[in-house]
């Protein structure tokens, strides 16, 4: 309710407003009034009913009447009613025509404040003394690469843990003092990088990633930061500059969830939690103009949803619903139009005045009206606080210091300009006397009376607020808000299980918003069950099925385990949002973990039923109800155990790359030691313990016992047999282990005991052990989610490459300060004048007519642009303005040919009267609202990349480099030209990123025009002014520019020549000149009935008020109709007609390359893009080292698990499974690679493809090529770590081909890793979400493994599936690896593998077996024995190879076919990417033409 009060200062005359519910924050519209009225009705109705019930109850139990009246007087009081339940004041009656929403909210707060015994209202202020924040320079001193990462961290370890040196540090915030009392609204001013964000985070007690000096003191009343973080986290919150929400959720669902999590226990009596939260969220949505987006997805930069401004308001509304007492807002007006930004500040002011909250707001572009609302101001200058105190006195303080405030400059702009040496103006007579450096400003402030008074005030506050009683009051107020069954010390409002319930509901809504992943899993797994079970279809109840029956059980367990690995992806998708909500004290991360398990259970259960039902009966496992349900129970339990194990790994790590390697190693270990790949008796002693810790091993033993116990299997093959050998009697034996001479069947129990050392008595014991694993890892997962803090944030630190850092240190530049002092050079100098000629000048006129665009939302066609017309001429800057959601960005996308959805139903776009040609997109520059750049590149590299590929090939490399240098200087980026782009907090800040975005488009020398989408968003006023001056300079050099702008001051707007003004629905309300001092614009609106523009008003804000788009305003007419009927509209059409006729007469450019879609040839594109992708991998050592570590550890683990396997029958099978398990890491390698591909594809598709920087063919080719070197390294590492420990090289000693076969094996392994990356590229090429690509890769990988001939040979496959044997690439790879590794070596059976039987009377073993051995092979251990023959069924490894279809003589053919499969992957990647992702724009063009 706190911020629902915010509109109390808004206009109260707008309840009849006719246009409510649009995208701007509307203040108290009739929609807000209706939402508040409904909330009031519910609360008042509940209160009246509660009153009646209590009175009825008191009559029935008169002996308790006094107690009840006392309770009633204490707890009732939401709406004043008399003893009959009638309203005392009809303005508070929701059913009365006199109801007043603003008055109701104010009165509700008064009543809450008066009933302190029940509601226990408190206020919290903030005081800080000697506040200093610092970071460790070693955390981010230079960019890590593949080569320097290890030395870097070894050096750090040696310095900190061996030498015990603390290492260099840098100050982020210098010592400062301040006091903010409850009800005071404070603005934090400073240029980007001055330390404003760090200051707000520190006040909000969110200092993870940097340090606070031990001598610093921060107090919240009498509470310490430690107490705030531990017990009252939700009372002090920080709203980050960036938006971070679940994109699949709707706005309504997002905000209702936040409201539920902070719904107090001491709410008005009779009002349920859900009703309270639902209606409070509705009120806040209405207040912030979000009601119309209730059912719209929030979205993000890559998923379509609400507009950027609306998404910012969602973040604001979420904090509002948090109802925190201390609110730290970090540039929260970014992306809002000026009128909405002003109303947001008014809302915070009302909250501070009425509810006595303590808001702190960092704001970069602050109008005078907004500044006048603030009580106090904090001015930051490179980490120094150079002023703190009254906002009204700040201006005079600096004037008295000796600085001059120019006319028309707002106070906030004046204060911020003081931190820029090039902007501040010294008053006459004060030259040389005023402070110049940050340190001098700081010292002046410390010595000033104002500074000394602040120190005294802080000391007094700390003394006054140190009592235990005050702490106890805050504790009681917090406890009153908490739900039942919650510890008073908990920072949360609702209990743990209520949190789980609400989060589970939210997760269901997320699944509903994007069901593709779960549907893909369900139908993919069920489909795979049909495929896999058909491989083992209808196994006979005979000994010939022993291997396949156990293999089928193993594969069932293995497949379920593989699918669980993907859950790590979804865990990391939600982690940043969960961490944010933890900081808001909405819920425990453990509650989210619990709820995620609960909401995944239905999907898991459906998959378990679907997969196992099909699989069990198609394979023909034991068909009795008890056995089936036990099989289902064990498989489902094993799935849950593996799910919790992998979730535990995800929760224990901080990045996805960190998680994938241990997860893959663990999966490999659990798979190898399940008991099938290496039977329990054959495991080496040193690794036998792994089997004991393997939940799959216990599940597998139970499944084997379930299938084999007390079951006889008919013998399929006898030794000896055929010819004249007897068909019965003791002189023959069945071939499987566990057979008895003379018996025609094998006892299943004996078979499993002798082969696997399994016991049926362990069946239910093992189930209990699996349950134990489930419970244990469930607890570890929950615990780790709660205590793992995630990746550490950094202070705002510029990051340089190591070589650049050395150069800077030689130049004595202090890069460790974390900030670079930005000196703005003067442009009117000789250098600039000489370089002006370098700016590309236009000459072509671009115009459009009746442009209409609509999208389908559900079943409704919504018009986004409605017959918009206009033009952009060389030398002119046209401003595109309108409220948030008016269609400004959509118009830019439509004009620049960047729409990817929807239909352009009408309209034309012409250049010089001619239709757009194929070179249009590369002939324009488009500075997008999102600053998307490759995070591993430096600023200079990003600019050079754009220049090389977008400037004509006729321009030399030297000229391109010179132009890049010029743009760097033009945009004042010299100080960080060699800095790494990085990520937020460790790299460029917001301002620097925006400058880079503009620079990337300028270095392309767009010859036609430049589009800029909110280029000043997120910048301080001085930087915004310099950007506008730059835009003006470009236009003066002949460039045509169309620029959207959200929060222009009058000074900024004056730099523009023309204005295209849109209202919601994409309707034009004005297109024309601005005129000197905006006279043309103002006269137009006043001529057609608009109220007079006050002389001191900002025309931008006045226009929004005129058309009814400003909060609390109402249009007196439909200005779209006014425009259509105006003479200006007719003049515009006449001008368009004239341009259509005259401009087409201009001669065409005779450049032969003019119509080419790309400036650079394909080969040059390929070289540059491949180099960039390779460099990105090189500079992302976490990816490469994770990849290498996975290969090395898995290969070593595999190699030593099968260490020097012998050539017994089981040994040969072990070596075969060692090859099989070597391939298992494929899907983990794919999952490691997918995020890197997606991040590069997002950058390409959002920015580089629309600008025609390079072709999609180049993009795919570069991705394929850049991975090959790393795959060769992986293959080499895998070869040495696996081939020699397994001992395959020993098999080649018998033929003296150790080196030849070793080299061939290396080549095959390298090809395997190349195949892995190409398969990953094939899977992700046409899919949007990497989770789905990972699922698809698992399915393809499973099929490749299943049909490669290891589990089931070609001869044993059902006839239908033989084609899959030939289509599986692993068929040929396994054939090569096994034949090269095993061919031409002798076989020696283990003791238990010999078949023992007696020869007939009078025969030696050799005499009896010789005819059989000539046909079937094998050898006798005791040829001359007449009592017992010991027969081994195999003599040389070639027999084993023939059984599995591997032929050494065909190794060349097989390796060639495998290479062909790699080629198929690559070709398929090109085709699928073109089919699924390239045609989007093409489809729109076709529909537009039709």
Curated annotation (Swiss-Prot):
ATP binds at residues 882-889. It comes from Candida albicans (Yeast). PROSITE patterns: ABC_TRANSPORTER_1 (PS00211), ABC_TRANSPORTER_2 (PS50893). Residues 151-407, 846-1090 form the ABC transporter domain. This is ABC transporter CDR4. SUPFAM superfamilies: P-loop containing nucleoside triphosphate hydrolases. Belongs to the ABC transporter superfamily. ABCG family. PDR (TC 3.A.1.205) subfamily. The keyword Membrane applies. It is a multi-pass membrane protein. Residues 1-26, 53-75 are annotated as: Disordered. One of its GO terms (cellular component) is membrane. Residues 1-516, 788-1182 are cytoplasmic.
